Regions:
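N-terminal low-complexity or simple alpha-helical regulatory segments
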Residues: 1-134
Length: 135
């Protein structure tokens, strides 16, 4: 029994988290569209004061909930697409600076995934080799 308890204690469980910086572009877009950002944050369970702390973390399901509520508020399922199209690499701060230094698409994707894995925990992206293509 002691061995079983020790094995359970040794298992690492990773709490999926997202840095607040990942939702800031969404809040900017929502404000520009006239949506009540504070209300949406409150409904999702994200204290509005966290927007002043981009390196703070929120549970990933809470960030997803904010995204869902935001889509409903704007009447679109494509909010991420709209935000992505409206955001330049310059708008991503130091993360964008790293990506701007990429020479090839492959390098851009590898660095982008590396940065993503730094901003989001409990969820991982990677590239895998499938012959002459990557998936």
């Amino acid at each position: 029994m002691v061995e079983r308890v020790a094995a359970i204690c040794d298992m690492q469980t990773e709490l999926p988290l997202a840095r607040v910086i990942t939702i800031l572009r969404y809040t900017d877009h929502l404000k520009a569209a006239g949506a009540s950002v504070d209300r949406l944050l409150c409904r999702a369970g994200i204290p509005a004061v966290l927007l002043d702390h981009p390196e703070a973390a929120v549970p990933l399901p809470t960030a997803f909930r904010f995204g869902e509520l935001s889509c409903q508020a704007l009447g679109t399922e494509h909010l991420g697409l709209h935000v992505g199209l409206a955001t330049s690499l310059d708008g991503l701060g130091p993360y964008g600076d790293v990506l701007k230094g990429c020479v090839t698409l492959y390098d851009y994707l590898r660095k982008g995934i590396s940065l993503y894995n730094m901003l989001i925990t409990g969820q991982h992206l990677w590239l895998s080799d499938h012959g002459e293509s990557y998936g």
